[in-house]
Amino acid sequence: MAYDPKGLTASEVTQLANAIDTWLDAVNNSLFGSLGWFVGHPYTLSFLTRYMHSMGNQTLSYDVIANEAAIRFANDRAVAAIKAGAGCYFDRVQKGGWENDDFETSLGAVGISYKVADQSAKGFYVKATIDDWYDFHAQATVEFPYLDYFACDWKGGNIIYDKWMDQLAEAGFAQRFRTHIEWTLFVPYTLE
């Protein structure tokens, strides 16, 4: 793939949007088990890995994306957390650190919240929101495209990537990289 130094090409933006759509569709339309590994994930991972690699491999983001075992580990932990908290409300949990062997901490700061949106005698909805902030090392020498804002609409208006880059220095270095992913899952469950 060829990369424009001023930003993603139209076809690349479309490819990324489609990959994310496929990825989230697989999550939204499935139950607990599919969170561990789903059809759209390899395609999304492959595209993001190629994109980050084209810009250099000195960022934590690339390390995380390239570490499929860490991603699977994180998904398994998310599944366990949802199952353990069925019917409960969890306050936001903050994780810190730069340990690449743990996906939750390798992002630097991860906030996860689970909330029961609606429940009845037959079941309830669990809404899980994950906000990830990627704060790059100040000494990073990786150049990123001049892309001030990138938004992907999924199913009638949900913003999946609110900002691809929050701030850009004049030289093209990313100061902050933010992603927002929101999952709404239906969990079949009979209340006692």
Where does each model-flagged region fall?
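Glycine-rich short-loop/terminal segments
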Residues: M1-V116, S120
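Acidic, glycine-rich flexible loop segments
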Residues: Q94-C152
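Active-site or metal-binding loop neighborhoods of secreted/extracellular toxin and effector enzymes
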Residues: D132-E192
